[in-house]
Amino acid sequence: MTMPSTANGGFPSVVVTAVTATTSISPDIESTWKGLLAGESGIHVLEDEYITKWDLPVKIGGHLKEPVDSHMSRLDLRRMSYVQRMSKLLSGRLWESTGSPEVDPDRFTVVVGTGLGGAERIVESYDLMNAGGPRKVSPLAVQMIMPNGAAATVGLQLGACAGVMTPVSACSSGSEAIAHAWRQIIMGDADVAVCGGVEGPIEALPIAAFSMMRAMSTRNDDPEGASRPFDKNRDGFVFGEAGALMLIETEEHAKARGAKPLARLLGAGITSDAFHMVAPAADGVRAGRAMTRSLELAGLSAKDVDHVNAHGTATPIGDSAEANAIRVAGCEQAAVYAPKSALGHSIGAVGALESVLTVLALRDGVIPPTLNYQTPDPEIDLDIVAGEPRYGDYRYAINNSFGFGGHNVALAFGRY
């Protein structure tokens, strides 16, 4: 029995027709892309009051170039969590960029992942209750705290009735959202989907928590050089704020409305390590299986893969495990790019952001340079794109996302 795939017509052809993002380099995706190609970094010294108040060991990160709240009304600020406000902003931009199309609500789905959701509202509500009792807690607290609030905001704003979902799978949440949206479409439950990931701002508690795990870089005197994916001297990740969404739909639906596809979404693989709560399995076997599964569903072989957009957090164990995963999947010939070297780590949003960058690499036939890759690690024998952008005839690419809890997600994209 032949395994169904996109290539053999077993699944409908799914295309990406619009993308949007806000990052520490620029509030729009095209300017972010140009900045990455030019070797820009969004990582700087943090000047927030909490850095000195708590004398945090990490004093660097990447705040959004343009604050989300500068686009919000007083009512939005009062009734929405931060991730809900980000979702509202990005979904509005995405929909406008695609011409605000008329779609059948019953064939329209939304999947938006996040790592923590509206966690800041839990702290605020607790402080209010501590100071004045339960009556001080807002009746809007529940809708702001619930992790599915960001996806629900998009579903309400755009009128999606084919399901609204919220993957909460740590650093793979954004990619898993795209995977589930693709599944909704190929299973016949939807024709079009808004999908991606959002995350809250850099705050003191996440810095403290991840620092205590020794997962973060402490190169405070060299912020732009701190995130060093796959480099022998890497010492941890750096936070970088971001959010990203994309519009995917069947090729038939896109053609019917006159949309111009940016790329194809060919397959999605999801596995889990069943190894450790926060450490990846060093052998990369299950992560590599996610990559292989995405290719099987796409109808591709490992040798077809021209480019891997790596999860590449710059942690010693994480990058080694990913290198092993790429070898397990047989994709070691692919040109590898690690965007966190320039943009930092945005947790629940990062998989979506890096998926968008993968789409743009295929669209333009160019891969940005991985910053700070200076001393190759002999244990990581990969073709890391560094120094300058690399132009080429890129047909197929995989985006990797791996998260605490042993979550592994790989998305296979193709040039349109």
Swiss-Prot record:
User: What is its EC class?
Assistant: transferase
Classification via CDD domains = KAS_I_II (cd00834)
What molecular function terms (GO) are annotated for this protein?
Answer: 3-oxoacyl-[acyl-carrier-protein] synthase activity
| Domain of life per record | Bacteria
What are its GO biological-process terms?
fatty acid biosynthetic process
- Localization annotation: Cytoplasm
GO cellular component terms attached to this protein's record = cytosol
Chief site of localization: cytoplasm
Stored InterPro entries: Beta-ketoacyl_synthase (IPR000794), Ketoacyl_synth_C (IPR014031), Ketoacyl_synth_N (IPR014030), PKS_Beta-ketoAc_synthase_dom (IPR020841), Thiolase-like (IPR016039)
What EC number(s) is this enzyme filed under?
2.3.1.293
What keyword terms does UniProt attach to this protein?
Acyltransferase, Cytoplasm, Fatty acid biosynthesis, Fatty acid metabolism, Lipid biosynthesis, Lipid metabolism, Transferase
Q: Which NCBIfam families match?
A: PRK07314.1, PRK07910.1
Described by its record, this protein's role is as follows:
Part of the mycobacterial fatty acid elongation system FAS-II, which is involved in mycolic acid biosynthesis. Catalyzes the elongation of long chain acyl-ACP substrates by the addition of two carbons from malonyl-ACP to an acyl acceptor. Involved in the initial extension of the mycolate chain and forms monounsaturated fatty acids that averaged 40 carbons in length.
Q: Known PANTHER family for this protein?
A: 3-OXOACYL-[ACYL-CARRIER-PROTEIN] SYNTHASE, MITOCHONDRIAL, POLYKETIDE SYNTHASE-RELATED
Name the family the entry cites. Answer: Belongs to the thiolase-like superfamily. Beta-ketoacyl-ACP synthases family.
Task: Give the protein's recorded name.
Answer: 3-oxoacyl-[acyl-carrier-protein] synthase 1
Biological source species: Mycobacterium leprae (strain TN)
Gene from which the chain derives: kasA
